[in-house]
């Protein structure tokens, strides 16, 4: 099933749907007021699909196209800028696994938008439009359990075992193997069934109900990387060699039971951690020989788990609060009066989230610090806290934020005790703390390792 990144906006809703194989051509029409319309062409089951215009044509401006070679190229992300006042997308930029378009449009200011899911490709668009393009969302699907199209990047390992029976081949055009079922006796693997993931649809080969089954529990983040087989003569010195046992290993270190009865001769099918995406071999009364298709690329490691750093400041008085974990921080809003009040604007899967104020605003007005998200992120927060009259258990009096690109000016007053939040090699993706009705007492952060994009 395709993953849908939502688009919310004014105008009329449109939806190209998620049942395409790939995006092949993009047409963008723009003018001074923003993007006037977009049109996307697709391929579905090998056949070209011409898309509809979303927006209004027939006005002055410019038209640009961006073409994608469906043979070995796919769309991975879209970036752009959105004018909140006009409610119109101002510019768009498209990126495939091979190339990136220029920023299409006149205005590269406003809120930056990004449509991207790591390890997935875009197969459809939806959004809102009227006289202009008001918003844009996308449908994503896996390009294989390792983030590539298995039809493009795979290797075929020759079958091994006996020479009897007839050849068979399931092919490499699958995302991965979900489960395998077996019927076997003391002499051979007699029958089996392989359940492949074909773009979210489970396709079965050899429709039997096996006595024993191996299932990849956490597919698609877990996948088979190794198949170990043994084979030998079914009858001693008969020369009729058959596969006698099979065992699997996964990307998360799990090892299956041995299916069948091990024999003396052994071989292993694997490709340096690549994902198993298909089988072939020879078959007669049982499985005579077995070979496999593996992805020719190594998967990227899964995203790191966030780490919660304990809050700093005074005592844990008032009410605890927790903004949660996000992809990153877009804006910081700080106000200083008798203490610090703050709020953050976050990004979570392209959705902008502005959370409530922590601490009581004094009415002076917030200082706003905007990050160049997603390329800019917070690395450290430095601050001071103190015990004051009426706040003997401590309040935060000053904060200063540092990113990978700059250090923002501090807000508030220095006091007796300083603190620092952050971790070397990590970025901040969320905040938590303690505050009462009018004071911020403690501040803590969530961090994740900085990875190369």
Curated annotation (Swiss-Prot):
Pfam families in alphabetical order: Jacalin (PF01419)
InterPro entries to which the protein is assigned, alphabetical: Jacalin-like_lectin_dom, Jacalin-like_lectin_dom_plant, Jacalin-like_lectin_dom_sf
One MF term in the entry's GO annotations: carbohydrate binding
SMART domains given in the database record: Jacalin
Residues modified to N-acetylalanine: 2
Record's keyword terms, sorted: Acetylation, Lectin, Repeat
Induction per the UniProt record: Up-regulated by abscisic acid and abiotic stresses. Regulated by the microRNA miR846. Abscisic acid also represses the expression of miR846, thus increasing the accumulation of JAL40.
Ranges of residues in domain Jacalin-type lectin: 1-142, 154-296, 306-449
Keyword Repeat among record annotations: yes
Domain of life: Eukaryota
GO biological-process terms attached to the record: response to abscisic acid
Tissue: Expressed in roots.
Protein family per UniProt: Belongs to the jacalin lectin family.
Protein name per Swiss-Prot or TrEMBL: Jacalin-related lectin 40
Native organism: Arabidopsis thaliana (Mouse-ear cress)
